[in-house]
Amino acid sequence: MDIIFYHPTFDTQWWIKALRKAIPQARVRAWKSGDNDSADYALVWHPPVEMLAGRDLKAVFALGAGVDSILSKLQAHPEMLNPYVPLFRLEDTGMGEQMQEYAVSQVLHWFRRFDDYRIQQNSSHWQPLPEYYREDFTIGILGAGVLGSKVAQSLQTWRFPLRCWSRTRKSWPGVQSFAGREELSAFLSQCRVLINLLPNTPETVGIINQQLLEKLPDGAYLLNLARGVHVVEDDLLAALDSGKVKGAMLDVFNREPLPPESPLWQHPRVTITPHVAAITRPAEAVEYISRTIAQLEKGERVCGQVDRARGY
């Protein structure tokens, strides 16, 4: 069994050593331009077209939860990967736990009004504020995949009303499910906190725009943990300035790194982190990949395969 590996920023030697230990029967090598030798599996992130083109692969693993970059490259270069080759993504591998930590900490930050107290502190103002009531602090999750499910589970501990919206209806205990465009307005109408965990597809680009934000309750909060292209930044800034949206916590942006001149940096109601909400944990990723390859070799059914038509 031959495995080729390519990632522009990861510690390649660490990965090769870990993969060889996890899959002793495999010959693992770092792919370099000009390497056209045979391979059974490819582990990639932002791969060059020539790495995958023309190869008779058993499967390709994207080294992250999102596959929008490789799918967009496939649209421009369909010869890059044969359509029958399955493409897998890292559905969790520790990212679910990180998303839970991020979402819970920020929801509680808003619920306890720490954002308001920070603004008061900036003006040396001492004033206790009325508390929010949990039953009025409904949290809505846009995107009901593996990570959305994990975030919902973590928030249930705090007894907030929960709802989710996705392409198809879900049956999550304690979570009200909405599905399809026809139910989006009803979903948004009660969301004091909107958490975005949608996949990046042509249908979801720009979905968080003026029209969507207007359907939220006044003074709602936005937590974007998915992709920057989901948010029309000018529309969000207008909603923040008007008070329609009271605060936003943003981990992802249309341009990354976020340019220094972006007005988001200086907005008093915006908090920024540099795309760190959920980072691939190498040891857990290697365990998932080695387990999945073993299942594929046995002809077993596996999880995490990407539907290229849907985009996730």
UniProtKB/Swiss-Prot annotation:
One of its GO terms (molecular function) is hydroxypyruvate reductase (NADPH) activity. Belongs to the D-isomer specific 2-hydroxyacid dehydrogenase family. GhrA subfamily. HAMAP family: 2_Hacid_dh_C_GhrA (MF_01666). CDD domains: GDH_like_2. It comes from Shigella dysenteriae serotype 1 (strain Sd197). It catalyses: glycolate + NADP(+) = glyoxylate + NADPH + H(+); (R)-glycerate + NAD(+) = 3-hydroxypyruvate + NADH + H(+); (R)-glycerate + NADP(+) = 3-hydroxypyruvate + NADPH + H(+). Signal peptide: none annotated. The lineage of its organism: Bacteria, Pseudomonadati, Pseudomonadota, Gammaproteobacteria, Enterobacterales. Coiled coil: none annotated. The active site is at R227, H275. The keyword Cell membrane does not apply. It is found in: Cytoplasm. Its EC number is 1.1.1.79, 1.1.1.81. It holds the Pfam family 2-Hacid_dh_C. This is Glyoxylate/hydroxypyruvate reductase A. Keywords: Cytoplasm, NAD, NADP, Oxidoreductase. One of its GO terms (cellular component) is cytoplasm. Catalyzes the NADPH-dependent reduction of glyoxylate and hydroxypyruvate into glycolate and glycerate, respectively. InterPro entries: D-isomer_DH_CS, D-isomer_DH_NAD-bd, GhrA_Enterobacterales, NAD(P)-bd_dom_sf. Its main location: cytoplasm.
